[in-house]
Amino acid sequence: MSAAGVPAELNNLGAPITATTQNPSGLANSQVTSGPVSSATQHDEHRSSAGNTLADEEDDKAVEAEKAEAIDAAGDGKQKRLPADSSEDIVAELEPHHVSVHRGKEEFAALERKYSNLSQRSQHELHRPTTRHSVRSSFSRKDRVVSRLTQDDAEKAKEGEGEFNLVEVLRSGRENQDEAGIKRKAVGVVWEDHEVIGAGGMRINIRNFSSAIIEQFMMPAIKVLGIFGFNPFAPKPKAILHPSSGLLKPGEMCLVLGRPEAGCTTFLKTITNQRAGYMEINGNVEYAGVGWKEMRKRYAGEVVYNQEDDDHLPTLTVAQTIRFALATKTPKKKIPGVSAKQFQDDMLDLLLSMLNIKHTANTIVGNAFVRGVSGGERKRVSIAEMFCSGATVCSWDNSTRGLDASTALDYAKSLRLLTDIMGQTTFVSLYQAGEGIYDQFDKVLVLNEGHVAYFGPAKEARQYMIGLGYRDLPRQTTADYLSGCTDVNERRFADGRDATNVPATPEEMGQAYRESEICARMTREREEYKHLMAEDATARENFKQAVLEQKHKGVGKKSPYTVSFLQQVFIIFKRQLRLKFQDHFGISTGFATSIIIALIVGSVYFRLPETASGAFTRGGLLFLGLLFNALTSFSELPSQMLGRSVLYRQNEYRFYRPAAFALAAVLADVPYNASVIFLFSIVLYFMGGLYSSGGAFFMFFLFVFLTFMVMSAFFRTLGVATSDYNVAARLASVLISFMVTYTGYMIPVQRMKRWLFWIFYLNPLSYGYEAIFANEFSRISLTCDSSYTIPRNIPEAGITGYPDTLGPNQMCSIFGSTPGDPNVSGSDYMAVGYSYYKAHIWRNFGILLGFFTFFMFLQMLFIEVLEQGAKHFSINVYKKEDKDLKAKNERLAERREAFRAGELEQDLSELKMRPEPFTWEGLSYTVPVPGGHRQLLNDIYGYVKPGSLTALMGASGAGKTTLLDVLASRKNIGVVEGDILMNGRPIGTDFQRGCAYAEQQDTHEWTTTVREALQYSAYLRQPQHVPKQEKDDYVEDIIELLELQELADAMIGFPNYGLSVEARKRVTIGVELAAKPELLLFLDEPTSGLDGQSAYNIVRFLKKLCAAGQKILCTIHQPNALLFQSFDRLLLLQRGGECVYFGDIGPDSKVLIDYLERNGAEVPHDANPAEFMLEAIGAGSRKRIGSDWGEKWRNSPEFAEVKREIQELKAEALAKPIEEKSNRTEYATSFLFQLKTVLHRTNVALWRNADYQWTRLFAHLAIGLIVTLTFLQLDNSVQSLQYRVFAIFFATVLPALILAQIEPQYIMSRMTFNREASSKMYSSTVFALTQLLSEMPYSLGCAVSFFLLLYYGVGFPYASSRAGYFFLMILVTEVYAVTLGQAVAALSPTILIAALFNPFLLVLFSIFCGVTAPPPTLPYFWRKWMWPLDPFTRLISGLVSTVLQDQEVVCKDGEYQVFPAPSGQTCQQWAGAFAEAVGGYINNPDSTGDCQFCQYRSGQAFFVPLEISFSTRWRDFGIFICYVVFNILVLLIAARFLKWQRR
């Protein structure tokens, strides 16, 4: 195997070398062989049924030589046509829209430049070969060399040093496969009567808080009805794709076109067996004669779908992402002498080189929230990953979104090349496909609302539509023309034709196609292929044999996976380890959090004495040590659910079984979690003074870690068992509350209510706690110190007659003590008090292992059986229509028909623009980077005149968005140099308000409807004096303009639950247009993600705005020639932020073309100037034409003219008097108007955010109910006295639940605010106040529900003064938690950082409030300042004193402390004075035998020693209010000064 033949096993990652082409008749296919064929028999096996064959092998070689010569000629820039009379039916002349494999091969030389871009070899090469003849063990006798990339590839490769010959690599791979006897995979796709039925037929209203509650209680009834086949809420079936048939042969590419909602995505998914989410799929789909069911079961990884969004694990590098995919798909059968690692290294090198992303190999992939590679590079990672799947049938959904024109063409040609040489069968849907892209396809499928309007040869599609009666639009690209014919607003009929005599409706177009000659031809071709597959099973058997040869040992013949289950586990295990240990921030914060918490807890319980006073606190220390680590595992729940989309896609590629992922993920977490828990245990254990021995410590660590693993498995299981995070969170809140309550710490098992004690035995925490409790107490003996001796001396009360040491008539007041014995065995203490026994330790170990095994089994079962992140088609939900909305929608419908008929046009005459020129001179922008600074923009000049539309274009990463941000004053980091002037003067405070900026990211308040989003923009950004009705009318005009009539009342939502990508983009533009910007309109990629017609509509409207006097600066990625011609002026940037052209485009781009040609770039007559200019300056992966274009621009007369024009514009502007306007303020509206409007929107948003509020209320109800059932109607016993305090302590749990919800909500809302604040819609103070005020109604509702359940359920005092105070404290607790959460969120840049504050705050507040560690037991350091500073101290103090004041206490049997009276004395005489002094009583004062002492007579006796006073409860209330006020001040200040938006 040669160096160029690195991927000799490409057959195992692709399909056969043969490439299917069509002869002029379109009926038959012929095969192009990319490498020598080993035998005539093998050659015949790949022969087309209707195509001609080569006479013999010599003829074959001759043709191959001619093709190679043609390729070489093309590489030299010459044109050499293959013989027209060759046996492969290669036509001599190619028609304008003709697509053939051979013309693609003539362009291979260009692809060699475009996909290599490699630098000269350096000492940092990834592989060893450095000379043309260096050979590795895996190379064949043909020593071709694949040049290697270095970190400087992107720049050096432009100079053409070391070209990467992709054709040679792929062909060599084929030759080596044949030599090794590796079978080829050739799979044609046949679909017949293929029909897809989805949900539809009913308008779904927006869910809100009330409907969520109703659903919760109605859902059980609905499910029961569903069992009997009756569901009134079931969606009605709707045909998404109507029956259609077709064939795509191996080596063919099909372009799928259609307007949004035409069914393109549905076709791509279902044709590749992605059937989840649809109600019904009818018809038949076969793959080389293999039925879709068998294909799904045994060969699922051979038929794959690539979604539009690029969803990867963001913290893995590009190389790691691709290498992982390769590892799971490395075939067993490879070229002799090639190891698995060599194969993976070579394939990785090939893919990085081929896709020109080698310079990003060690850069993390990133996503919308994690900074990584660019969007275009991320798209290429998706392409590489899908290629690694080795699939033979691939479908790509809008894969060029976000790519510039040159890169998009590169991508299309790469698919063409891979399809040709690898024999893949490829379906692609694209928006805005240029002519160069369209020419790569063999066939095209045009869909119109699910009906097939055309399926056949791509070269004949345009003429077919013209033949139907549609007018030819020569300036439109073929792809746009075809999809435009399905759009009633865009299509044009030929002269003398109209909708009455031309197939116009979807049904009519479908019928016309079915009756056409092309359809008949496609039918014959399909039947011939089916007949061939039925008669000759060679292709099918070769495919099955090739798949079988890939499988490793341990993989079943019927399994769709390549490597065994254990191999999958190992591969995933390594990936998860990398994920964990590459997250340096997460690791460091995890260790820091754990150690700091351990230090705090350990210092509170520092060196606990082995005495009676240390018994309860020792149990508290053990409980906290176990509970903290166990609940830390809760983080597994969101992480399990967030990774579903990647898991689902990679499982669809059949990289691994989901169960393998479940097992590997758990194993990979062990090293990190064990290390964290070990350090935590060391600090806590030895600081707390627990039993000092190695065996005791490691037993403690073992059970803490094992309990953590059990809880981790439990939360993972919960995550895979539920489809919605909010549902999982609600379940978790209930289960965690039960687990914590029934651990055995607060309530020993023998004292639990009989109807709930069984929870203790189903609770993993109880077994872990008993084990560490028994491990500790079985090793120690407790000495009774004086404060626990009964009776004892109390000098301050004048009681001094008792022995100084415990005598025979005294006892220790702890469990397990006996009269006269000063020592209490730890075993007796835990046996009597908790029913814990040392003998249970290893029993509990086995039980915990059983729990772990059970949860892991359930997790692996659920993750295999239940759908994990399956993508369903998007649905829209609508605001319920009232009378006003109905009238507006009827008016929109009427006007829509008038617009279609050409009777109406948008009236822009009322727009008021300020005719002021906008100029910039010498503009540079520099940002700080590690180790120095980086210049992103370099000395740029330009201007925008009133009434002009200026395009800003350039390569990805050239600085287009950066320039827009700088010009729009959106940057808040770095240094901007140069002058930015409006009307010849520095920009003023009203500049940002007077400009509109449609950003590339479509960031909106997701709960608003389209109409509401536009209305809020109009209300807050248009001057306040403009009447509301006028603003509303203008919003309706914008809705018409953007063709959003049917979506006007649809909620914006988020992907798969709301508007589609292209509709969301139109809303983004509409929001900015609704502001009626007076100064300038900036748009960043307004047409990205839109189909050609939508893009043209947007640009057409921008032209209308310009005609009304607007100034517009707009970046654009993939304009076709017609779209490009709509712009007046162009600003072109090259990499490095340098301007290479600024000036007029001219009619037919004449001015721009003249400039390019004068500087050495000859523009082909049929080229799209927008694409060619990018290639000329090296914007794509092709080498630039000529020398530095930036230097050429700076030395050009055009540049000098630009500077002169800028000076003229400035002089003219300065000569005019300044027009003073009263509304030139920072904000368009007053503070109160902003507050009122934004508060209304936020209230609506929270009301519609149903799951957010319902989850919060549900948690309060659940905890309140659990506490009530646990402590139901407590009596007046000592035990009940303590339980009252524990019940009150549950009020401190509420802030933990609230913080977990409030912080993400605030931070996500802040993202929307940051976008809107950039446009000066409203102030940060308004944002913070509305976020706070809108939460208050829900805080009140939660407080009422929790109070009613807790207060009256437990049986607290009924007096209104007590109940009223208790409710006020609960209400303030709710408000405090909300303000604290929002303050923490305002101080935090991300949700993760905010979440890191929570453990510190909650642990501190809970420990120091006086319940788990009473104030007298706290170390002096903490007791002096932290206990009085703790907000929960005020909460507990106020509630405990209110509930227990004057509470009578009567001991039950078993609660008395029993000790004998001295001979000759009664119990009253012996202990009466003591009992009176400590607030207890003697139950049998006259007895001379055993005395029964009750520790408490009233509630005061319990809380006074804890330094709690009933008289200070209103002071505590006031101090608690002060904490709320403090949080609000922090919130307002942080919101004002901390935007956390680096731009």
From Swiss-Prot:
**What's in the keyword line of the UniProt record?**
ATP-binding, Cell membrane, Glycoprotein, Membrane, Nucleotide-binding, Repeat, Transmembrane, Transmembrane helix, Transport
Broad class of where this protein is predominantly found: membrane
**Start and end residues of each stretch annotated as Disordered:** 1-85, 119-157
- Write down the chemical reaction(s) this protein catalyses: itraconazole(in) + ATP + H2O = itraconazole(out) + ADP + phosphate + H(+); voriconazole(in) + ATP + H2O = voriconazole(out) + ADP + phosphate + H(+); fluconazole(in) + ATP + H2O = fluconazole(out) + ADP + phosphate + H(+)
What the entry lists under Gene3D superfamilies is as follows: P-loop containing nucleotide triphosphate hydrolases
Pfam families reported for this sequence: ABC2_membrane, ABC2_membrane_7, ABC_tran, PDR_CDR
Bias (Basic and acidic residues) occurs at 62-83, 140-157
What membrane topology does the UniProt entry give?
Multi-pass membrane protein
Where it sits in the cell: the answer is: Cell membrane
Which is an annotated GO molecular function term of this record?
A: ATP binding
Residue stretches spanning the membrane: 585-605, 619-639, 670-690, 695-715, 727-747, 845-865, 1254-1274, 1285-1305, 1336-1356, 1366-1386, 1391-1411, 1517-1537
Give residue ranges for domain ABC transporter.
222-474, 918-1160
GO cellular component, as recorded? plasma membrane
Spell out where the chain is glycosylated.
117, 208, 398, 823, 1223
Composition bias, Polar residues: 18-41
PANTHER family, alphabetically? ATP-BINDING CASSETTE TRANSPORTER
Q: What function does this protein fulfil?
A: Major pleiotropic ABC efflux transporter that confers resistance to structurally and functionally unrelated compounds including azoles such as fluconazole (FLC), itraconazole (ITC), posaconazole (POS), and voriconazole (VRC). Is also able to efflux the eukaryote protein synthesis inhibitor cycloheximide (CHX).
Q: Which protein is depicted?
A: ABC multidrug transporter AFR1
Query: What gene is behind this protein?
Result: AFR1
